[in-house]
């Protein structure tokens, strides 16, 4: 049975970058664990803000967070109130100085993580899984995705036996290194149990000279 390699890990250092960027010897394990807890806390705090990616950089005891979100206004707040509150909460919880940068996602319909979370939200609202998948796929294609694949796994439609179903439109070349593949995963907590949602979005090929730049 063939298994899928993670699209980010497969392309790290080629056309994808690490989401935690720092070097350490003695504190490596504690930093990895702290990064996990920071992401968990920020995701929980900003769950309604369409947060796709949390990048972490460390230098001289300071932590820099780069948040990619579809709704930057909610993250920043009026006159920067919300972002200052988040910075203060993080400083109090983790005893470190934080700086936060917010990047807007112009097209959330072609961001795999946001698409996966959108499908999971629909499943929790009891929308039929096939309808949710097809509607999302057609929307992503309309907004410029060259290809998209969506997979749902679990007790679909309340079935006794768990299974997985997937739907694809366009090209999704997972083994082509120069392909710009975005990947996202989300979980739908339904009355029948958890349904896992995976999304792969192909945004086009990145040529060698673009990678070098």
Swiss-Prot record:
Q: Which CDD domains match?
A: KH-II_30S_S3
Q: Which Pfam families match?
A: KH_2, Ribosomal_S3_C
Q: A GO CC term?
A: cytosolic small ribosomal subunit
Q: Does the keyword RNA-binding apply?
A: yes
* Top-rank taxon: Bacteria
Q: Name one GO biological process term.
A: translation
From the UniProt record, report the name of the gene that encodes this protein.
Answer: rpsC
- What is this protein called in UniProt? Small ribosomal subunit protein uS3
* PROSITE patterns for the chain: KH_TYPE_2, RIBOSOMAL_S3
